[in-house]
Amino acid sequence: IADNIGSKFIILDEKREVVRIILNHIYIDIANQVSSTIEGDLCSRDFSINSIAFLFDKKCLFDPLNGLKDLEISLLRTHSENNLLNDPLRILRCFRFVSELNFKIDFNLITFIKKNKGKLYLVAKERINYEIQKIVNGANALDAVLLIKKLNIFGTDNLSEDSFFLDLEKINYAELNQEEKE
């Protein structure tokens, strides 16, 4: 496909057969079907906006979870909490969507995040660091960081005392709060 449209091709996960095509700053991820049905695959994705497929045989989009509607209104919504629990890093990915794309997070997803934020300790620090870098470099970083603060994502009530998250408490929230008031 990449050769036919003159785009860049990157292997993201050779074992799971996931590749990315980049064309004019547009990223298209292509994955081999894992479930017995395309709907099963899409329903195992993290967010509805990532649960849209192009059916080559029918030349149309397949959107069983209404991801296109959520894209139109910039809403981040999940189909299944278990999909997020399979990789707790997805909790932080929510804030990256806020930071980079100015998405709003669905109320049910906020409730899930509050309930499960302590599971972030299960994720490798390097992966968390990558997401934090993406969050703080987004166009709406302040909104995302303030939401992270409001939901107490890195609060010590959820993490062990030797956690590297405790360093994040040193963020100058007073300065962030002042910027929010301006």
Segments (PLM) and residue ranges:
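Catalytic cores of the polymerase beta-like nucleotidyltransferase superfamily
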Residues: 1-182
